Each structure stands twice: as C-alpha cells, then as structure tokens.
Amino acid sequence: KALEVGERHRVLQLPTGTGYQATLLSRLCRWVYTREPDRVVRRAAEKRFRSLGVRNVVAHAGEAEGGWPEQAPFDRILLSTGFDDAPAALLEQLQPDGVLVVPLGPDPLVRSVTRITRTGGGFEREQLLTLPPAVLGAI
C-alpha cells in the first residue's frame, strides 16, 4: 500500500530473495526488476518465476545499494534491506514523482520503514512505522 503501485509502473525490488515480493508486485505492475547478489538464491527465484508463469520479472546479479542504473528510471523502488540512510544511487534512479520504500535508521536492530517521494524540488520523506528486531527480517 505504501508503495502505491500502478499497473503501468516499472518497479525495482531489492534484493530478490525467494522471489515472493517480486511475484506479488508482478501482479500489480507492468515490469519488476530485481537484483540478488547470491547466485544460488537468484536462480532458485528465477525457477519459481518460471514455474508460476511470471513473465514480467527480470532478475539479475547485483547488490541492493547500487540499484540497477542500466534499467532506470523506476516509478517505484522497494527495498527489504535496511540502511542508515537511503542510498543516493537509488534516489537518482527514481522517476519524478517516484516512490522509494526502505527500512532506515542507524540501529540495524530497529529501523523505520520510510517512504521517500521524488518531487520537483528534491525528496520528501515520511516515516511509516518502526520495526522491532523480531519483525525486521520478515519484510
């Protein structure tokens, strides 16, 4: 809901993990681009995509903080990896009026899910909720 995904959107989802989030997003938008640094994990997710008939997800090797500049710009970016602050490389890959949702905060055990919207004058941030340690890994 916080991502406000539309059927014509191009979404970057990081990291791929099991492919669950990318599969859900694939039902809501035009294209999902996802990156995963672990080759075994990525290949397992790609196999799941094929077995489910998901054809609008593109998976590639790579780290979350770099995004996917070759495929940018994106209408939406969803990260399940937390950061102290939003990586500048990802903010640069947002379309105007694009939205990034990411767990942020200096304490890796307690992060706040934050929505960042690219505006004409920069970026607006909205803290949505703070996750306790037991929930953080389940995003």
PLM segments and residue spans:
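Conserved nucleotide-cofactor-binding alpha/beta core module
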Residues: 2-123
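Conserved histidine-centered catalytic loops in small-molecule metabolism enzymes
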Residues: 119, 125-138
